[in-house]
């Protein structure tokens, strides 16, 4: 029989949607010649805020 290990929920990944501005947006970022621009059109399902649907793509 293998030994049991205890998993703590507070360690590592914490589920939930974070505010976009706090996690991805960096206003002081300066573009480089090697950067690639990608555009996505997102249509949220009924009842889903547009910002949350956009975060799912990010």
Curated annotation (Swiss-Prot):
Q: Its quaternary structure?
A: Heterohexadecamer of 8 large chains and 8 small chains.
Q: Which GO biological process categories is it annotated with?
A: photorespiration; reductive pentose-phosphate cycle
The organism named in the record is: Rosa damascena
Q: Which residues form the propeptide?
A: 1-2
Q: Which Pfam family, an example, fits this chain?
A: RuBisCO_large_N
Q: From the UniProt record, list the reaction(s) this protein catalyses.
A: 2 (2R)-3-phosphoglycerate + 2 H(+) = D-ribulose 1,5-bisphosphate + CO2 + H2O; D-ribulose 1,5-bisphosphate + O2 = 2-phosphoglycolate + (2R)-3-phosphoglycerate + 2 H(+)
E.C. number, please?
4.1.1.39
Family membership, please give it.
Answer: Belongs to the RuBisCO large chain family. Type I subfamily.
Keyword list (alphabetical) reads:
Acetylation, Calvin cycle, Carbon dioxide fixation, Chloroplast, Lyase, Methylation, Monooxygenase, Oxidoreductase, Photorespiration, Photosynthesis, Plastid
Location in the cell: Plastid, Chloroplast
Q: Function, please?
A: RuBisCO catalyzes two reactions: the carboxylation of D-ribulose 1,5-bisphosphate, the primary event in carbon dioxide fixation, as well as the oxidative fragmentation of the pentose substrate in the photorespiration process. Both reactions occur simultaneously and in competition at the same active site.
| Tagged with keyword Lyase | yes
Source organism, top-level taxon: Eukaryota
Q: What GO CC terms are in its UniProt record?
A: chloroplast
Q: Which molecular function terms from Gene Ontology are attached?
A: monooxygenase activity; ribulose-bisphosphate carboxylase activity
The record's misc note reads: The basic functional RuBisCO is composed of a large chain homodimer in a 'head-to-tail' conformation. In form I RuBisCO this homodimer is arranged in a barrel-like tetramer with the small subunits forming a tetrameric 'cap' on each end of the 'barrel'.
Q: Which residues carry this modification: N6,N6,N6-trimethyllysine?
A: 14
- Name of this protein: Ribulose bisphosphate carboxylase large chain
- Sites where N-acetylproline occurs are at 3
> Is Lyase set as a keyword in this record?
yes
Q: Which SUPFAM superfamilies match?
A: RuBisCO, large subunit, small (N-terminal) domain (SSF54966)
């Amino acid at each position: 029989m293998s030994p049991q290990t205890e998993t703590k929920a507070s360690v590592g990944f914490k589920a939930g949607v974070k505010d976009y501005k706090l996690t991805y947006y960096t206003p002081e970022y300066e573009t480089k010649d090697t950067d690639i621009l990608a555009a996505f059109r997102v249509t949220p399902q009924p009842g889903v805020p547009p910002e949350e649907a956009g975060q799912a793509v990010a």
